[in-house]
């Protein structure tokens, strides 16, 4: 959607999965000529530099990012998502919505942002970024906190390890 509106926040995202396990991930941001990449067990990179997730350990000092479906037909579900958005906005330094799941997750992996969550997402939008985040040291789960996130229905939380459990609790109204 961003690309079609000439908003320069979009990416080319490619992942390789073998026997049910993500092996390679690349997210390329052509607007900024940034290539985020990872190979399972070999670390994560931004262009030619190794990268790590932030060391955030306090939600109140964390900057978050999320995505919202642009075609949600169920008002009740969208209202619930907006309540969570508001709650996490109030408990953090803020929540951004950039419009590209691949960029969102890559920014968490690089330490620019501290946490990401999204539900009702396509697996091709999160596969590369999820591996990159894992290899950069992020905790990556589904919205319920299960590490086996790459199965339908697709949802994802990727964050600095020090704030992950708190984000998951809030997403599940267990605060």
Positions of predicted regions on the chain:
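An extended, acidic
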Residues: 52-175
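DPxDG-like acidic metal-binding loop motif
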Residues: 1-45
């Amino acid at each position: 959607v961003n690309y079609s509106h000439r908003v320069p926040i979009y990416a080319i995202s490619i992942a390789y999965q073998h026997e049910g396990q993500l092996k390679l991930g690349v997210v390329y941001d052509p607007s900024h000529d940034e290539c985020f990449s990872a190979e399972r067990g070999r670390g994560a990179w931004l262009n030619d530099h190794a990268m790590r997730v932030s060391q955030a350990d306090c939600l109140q000092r964390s900057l978050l990012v999320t995505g919202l479906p642009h075609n949600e037909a169920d008002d009740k579900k969208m209202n619930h998502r907006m309540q969570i958005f508001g709650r996490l906005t109030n408990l953090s330094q803020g929540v951004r919505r950039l419009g590209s799941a691949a960029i969102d997750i890559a920014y968490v992996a690089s330490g620019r942002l501290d946490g990401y969550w999204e539900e009702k997402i396509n697996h091709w939008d999160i596969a590369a970024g999820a591996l990159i985040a894992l290899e950069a040291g992020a905790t990556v789960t589904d919205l319920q906190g299960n590490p086996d996130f790459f199965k339908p229905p697709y949802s994802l939380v990727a964050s600095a390890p020090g704030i992950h459990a708190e984000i998951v609790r809030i997403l599940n109204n267990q605060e």
